[in-house]
């Protein structure tokens, strides 16, 4: 049993992550019966069920449609507001726009960063897009 929890505690934890990720209807299905996006949300649930202090997410929205991506980013934002640290690797401006801090990494080194000091997701997305344009032009080194 996961993390040595008793089955009843596990079921409560399972539903607490399954409902926000909209996978509660998938719990009795086999992997071949669900879509790629549903599998992605199940993977997130597996990562969250033990309530880790640090969540590492590598392209968590890669297999998701835009609605599911937005919902997942809301889950991550809520987790972060409740004290969990979320470190996410992404190429998605939309996914990064909700972050408090965005690091731009090139050749394994941090070469620029942005802090979100109260910007809306739209405003932060614009800052990220502008920074990416400057990086591509070579304006930031």
Where are these regions (language model features)?
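Conserved catalytic loops of ABC-family nucleotide-binding domains
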Residues: 75-88
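Catalytic Walker B motif of ABC-type/P-loop ATPase nucleotide-binding domains
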Residues: 55-58
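Hydrophobic anchor residue at the start of the ABC signature
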Residues: 44, 72
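Conserved ABC ATPase "signature" region
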Residues: 8-25
